[in-house]
């Protein structure tokens, strides 16, 4: 730390790392990724090369691409300083149509954001996030939240 002190280097913990991961919309196993979620649902189609020789799961992914995914990972901005946490419900009226995977206050963008999986037939609907017992309006926002790979 002494060597980097003149350049502003300071210790950072897991919270800082997770916030940076979240703002860049990078998937984390146990949140956006699990053994029930496909790469196409997670927005990772760029890593799936269906034109390459056969690989485990190729037929299933080709079928999913042809018919469409059952759910989609979306980004949301919440009203006010409400914070959506993992597991909070995404609501379409009175119906639960998805679940929050990650959410926090973004110190870089100065707003409350979350990522959530939403059923394919509800991705274009008006949605709310159930924060504790209150539905909070959620506006779709493109992923990644902070698109640049470098800070300047």
Predicted regions located by residue number:
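Conserved, structured C-terminal
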Residues: 1-152
């Amino acid at each position: 730390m002494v060597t980097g002190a003149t350049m502003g280097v300071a210790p950072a913990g897991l919270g800082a790392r997770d916030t940076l991961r979240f703002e860049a919309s990078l998937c984390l196993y146990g949140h956006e990724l699990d053994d029930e979620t496909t790469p196409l649902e997670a927005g990772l189609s760029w890593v799936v090369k269906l034109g390459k020789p056969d690989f485990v799961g190729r037929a299933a992914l080709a079928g999913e691409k042809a018919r469409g995914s059952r759910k989609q990972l979306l980004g949301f901005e919440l009203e006010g300083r409400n914070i959506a946490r993992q597991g909070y419900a995404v609501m379409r009226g009175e119906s639960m149509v998805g679940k929050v995977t990650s959410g926090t206050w973004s110190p870089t963008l100065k707003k409350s954001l979350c990522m959530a999986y939403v059923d394919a037939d509800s991705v274009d609907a008006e949605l709310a996030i159930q924060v504790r017992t209150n539905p909070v309006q959620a506006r779709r926002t493109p992923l990644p939240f902070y698109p640049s790979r470098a800070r300047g």
